[in-house]
A protein has these predicted regions:
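Predominantly recognizes leucine-rich repeat
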Residues: 1-144, 149-169, 174-271
Length: 271
């Protein structure tokens, strides 16, 4: 069912008579603020797009009954603040995009999304997910995106946290446990260093660091790395030689990293 750009639609219809629906597109329904609870009855639904539903602030918990849902797009829902507590029940979910939302805290059940392969919170400037599940859900003590534990997302291959106002590299420590991760975008953030355990990512191929203007050093990176995008990393001063495996890789650095290369110093390791 394609209802995209129905700009006067304020509530979704009752879906109880179309339970065999596999795709539901509500992209660009800029007046939509309420989703009918019968959405949870769509047992065969595998694709749901609510992209750019600017008035949408929440979803009924029954959305987590969508056992076949594989792709869920919530990007551009700038007023959307909170996922249902049982979000982790979406056990078949492979892709979740929430770019530009106002999500503040991830439910603890998020760690149960073992099939999740693509996750994007680009432009969520916070204060989104807290690293401590026991903190008050309405806490206003955070001024930047603070990562929640992600270590159990063993299938995750692509993660975008660009422009999330991450200011402390230590909050990225949990990334070192994402054993399947291939593409990691941390561009446009405010951290000074990256955690050393990023070297534990055996399949990491692409690392995005563009416009991380406070970043001063790159630690050892996994040998699987193929591309480091670091344009406008104007404070970058030190790169571990071990990040590139050999002197040859260091000589060919310009093919792999884009930064003010003339003043970068290479070290045998960064503690």
């Amino acid at each position: 069912m394609n209802l995209k750009h129905s700009k006067f639609l304020t509530e979704t219809p009752d879906f109880s008579r179309v339970t065999n629906l596999e795709r539901l597109v509500l992209k660009g329904c800029i007046s939509l603020y309420k989703v009918h609870p019968s959405l949870g009855d769509l047992n065969k639904l595998n694709f749901l797009s609510l992209k750019n539903c600017k008035m949408l602030k929440s979803l009924p918990s029954c959305i987590c009954d969508l056992k076949c849902l594989e792709i869920f797009i919530l990007s551009g829902c700038s007023k959307f603040e909170e996922l249902p507590e049982n979000f982790g029940n979406l056990e078949m979910l492979k892709e979740f995009c929430a770019d530009g939302t106002a999500i503040r805290v991830l439910p603890s059940s998020f760690s149960l999304l073992r099939n999740l392969e693509i996750l994007s919170f680009e432009g969520c400037k916070g204060p989104p997910p807290s690293i401590s599940w026991w903190l008050p859900r309405r806490s206003s003590n955070f001024s930047s995106f603070v990562l929640s534990p992600l270590s159990s997302l063993s299938s995750l291959k692509t993660l975008s946290l660009s422009a999330c106002n991450i200011s402390d590299g230590a909050t990225l420590d949990s990334l070192g446990f994402l054993s399947s991760l291939e593409d990691l975008d941390l561009s446009e953030n405010n951290f000074v260093t990256l955690p050393s355990n990023i070297s534990r990512l055996p399949h990491l191929k692409m690392l995005g660091l563009e416009n991380c203007k406070r970043l001063q050093a790159l630690p050892e990176l996994p040998t699987s790395i193929r591309s480091i995008m670091a344009r406008n990393c104007t404070s970058l001063e030190t790169i571990s030689n071990q990040s590139f495996g050999s002197l040859l890789m260091t000589v060919r650095l310009k093919e792999h990293i884009y930064c003010p290369i003339n003043r970068v110093r290479f070290s045998s390791g960064i503690s």
